[in-house]
């Protein structure tokens, strides 16, 4: 099914070609059009519902790729790597790579909001994934072009363990379980020698200390504490199902 407006149809076909997909693919064009319509354009016909679906789809796509590529990787690392892959920063980066901003319908009031641009692009990217998934009820229109991005990023993250985002993984778990965020308490323990572990961090939830760690920076110490906590409180099967 094509759209009523030939110009919009051509725009969407251009995007599909950038994704490396044939325009004869079983795409529901009306959904793809909706995925690229910001709420400022229409309060009812916009990408918000597709973004909700796409949020789950991108996490599934990342999880499957990681499982296939790194079958021996600890499941806790899977969650930490995936938290980076599905972050707004990465999704907005991919959206720019495919020129989504050229096809995203946004009212003038939002176009001047430069601060919110990254969030808009990430949301639209998720919505596009949602539209493609709902077109076939599987990942066949997504994995052929998304896998190699995620695979390359995952390899870079594994080479630099500091990029593993256990803080995000822990936050995701606590929000899902308790609807609250963990609390981090950081103290400076080694001011004299800044080349060594300078900060100690503790992570707390509901009055209970979940983990502690040290690092050369506050961020590194918090990540170390989050890793201890996350791996201690989340069974492997629960991490896999997040």
Swiss-Prot record:
InterPro entries: dsRBD_dom, RNase_III, RNase_III_dom, RNase_III_sf. Keywords: Cytoplasm, Endonuclease, Hydrolase, Magnesium, Metal-binding, mRNA processing, Nuclease, RNA-binding, rRNA processing, rRNA-binding, tRNA processing. Mg(2+) binds at residues 51, 123, 126. It is found in: Cytoplasm. Its cofactor is Mg(2+). Transmembrane segments: none annotated. The keyword Nucleotide-binding does not apply. Its EC number is 3.1.26.3. The keyword tRNA processing applies. GO terms for biological process: mRNA processing; regulation of gene expression; rRNA processing; tRNA processing. GO terms for molecular function: double-stranded RNA binding; metal ion binding; ribonuclease III activity; rRNA binding. It catalyses: Endonucleolytic cleavage to 5'-phosphomonoester. Residues 12-137 form the RNase III domain. Homodimer. This is Ribonuclease 3 2.
């Amino acid at each position: 099914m094509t759209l009523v407006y030939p110009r919009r149809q051509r725009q969407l076909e251009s995007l599909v070609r950038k994704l490396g997909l044939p325009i004869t693919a079983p795409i529901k064009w009306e959904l793809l059009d909706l995925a690229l319509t910001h709420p400022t354009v229409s309060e009812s016909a916009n990408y918000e519902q597709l973004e909700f679906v796409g949020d789950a789809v991108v996490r599934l796509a990342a999880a499957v790729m990681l499982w296939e590529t790194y079958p021996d990787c600890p499941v806790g690392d899977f969650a930490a790597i995936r938290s980076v892959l599905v972050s707004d920063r990465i999704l907005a980066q991919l959206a720019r790579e495919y020129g989504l901003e050229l096809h995203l319908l946004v009212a003038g009031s939002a176009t001047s909001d430069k601060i919110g641009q990254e969030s808009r692009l990430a949301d639209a990217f998720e919505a596009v994934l949602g539209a493609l998934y709902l077109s076939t009820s599987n990942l066949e229109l997504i994995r052929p072009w998304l896998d190699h991005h995620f695979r390359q990023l995952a390899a870079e993250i594994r080479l630099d363990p500091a990029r593993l985002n256990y803080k995000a993984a822990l936050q995701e778990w606590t929000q899902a379980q308790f609807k609250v965020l963990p609390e981090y308490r950081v103290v400076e323990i080694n001011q004299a020698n800044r080349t060594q572990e300078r900060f100690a961090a503790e992570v707390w939830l509901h009055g209970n200390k979940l983990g502690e760690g040290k690092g050369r920076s506050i961020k590194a110490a918090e990540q170390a504490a989050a890793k201890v906590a996350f791996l201690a409180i989340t069974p492997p099967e629960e991490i896999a199902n997040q």
